[in-house]
């Protein structure tokens, strides 16, 4: 009887140890964000910041390290080729606003990233690949010209005066000769603006880009 009790105790201890050691599949990384946004387009900072959360059923699980990889394509990231940044294994519990530290990022280009974490109960696998798009990084990259009335609305009106029309509808027809893989629109307006493509509105923004003192600063989306 004593031997049976000892054997049962050993079995229970082994089962308990198995339950306390999570596998890499049970440690998942979720809610990956760049500049606190999900797969954003139009990031205009040279060193974007990454954030993520750890999801696991195991109690008392805390992050002890992370590793981030960034590439110009999802394919390069999968095979770890032509990486623009590989942070290496960093011993840190930081999971918010980790700044990009790789090669210089180009304006108007898409990038792809992933992260895996190390915890006090083991390491996880690579997260799903996420993406973000860079915007215009300096004034020299803005090539567009203002469109609207060619002259002041009323004789003698000053530049900062009100215009005659409360709202304007401007149309620009164009054709593309090649298959479109990716297209990004940068739009700015003095006041609220909405954009439609082939009759369909392309965003749900309200009062975009945003109010400002137009004689000194104009935002864009």
Protein language model features and the residues they cover:
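Pro/Thr/Ser/Gly-rich low-complexity, intrinsically disordered linker/stalk tracts
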Residues: 23-59, 129-139
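Short beta-strands within extracellular/lumenal beta-sheet-rich domains
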Residues: 164-176, 217-221
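Aromatic-lined ligand-binding clefts that engage carbohydrates, nucleic acids, or primary amines
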Residues: 174-177, 181-197
């Amino acid at each position: 009887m004593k031997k049976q009790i000892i054997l049962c105790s050993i079995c229970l201890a082994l089962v308990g140890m198995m339950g306390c050691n999570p596998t890499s599949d049970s440690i998942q990384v979720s809610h990956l964000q760049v500049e606190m946004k999900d797969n954003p387009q139009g990031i205009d900072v040279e060193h974007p910041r990454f954030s993520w959360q750890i999801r696991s059923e195991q109690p008392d699980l805390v992050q002890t390290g992370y590793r981030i990889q960034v590439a110009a394509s999802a394919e390069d990231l999968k095979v770890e080729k032509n990486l623009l940044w590989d942070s290496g294994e960093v011993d840190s519990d930081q999971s918010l606003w980790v700044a990009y530290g790789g090669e210089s990022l180009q304006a108007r280009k898409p990038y792809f990233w992933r992260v895996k974490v190390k915890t006090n109960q083991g390491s996880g696998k690579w997260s799903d690949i996420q993406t973000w798009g860079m915007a215009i990084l300096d004034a020299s990259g803005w090539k567009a010209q203002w469109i609207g009335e060619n002259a002041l609305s009323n004789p003698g009106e000053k530049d900062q005066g009100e215009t005659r029309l409360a709202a304007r509808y401007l149309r620009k027809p164009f054709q593309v000769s090649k298959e479109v893989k990716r297209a990004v629109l940068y739009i700015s307006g003095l006041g609220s603006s909405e954009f439609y493509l082939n009759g369909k509105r392309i965003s749900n923004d309200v009062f975009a880009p945003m109010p400002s003192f137009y004689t000194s600063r104009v935002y864009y989306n």
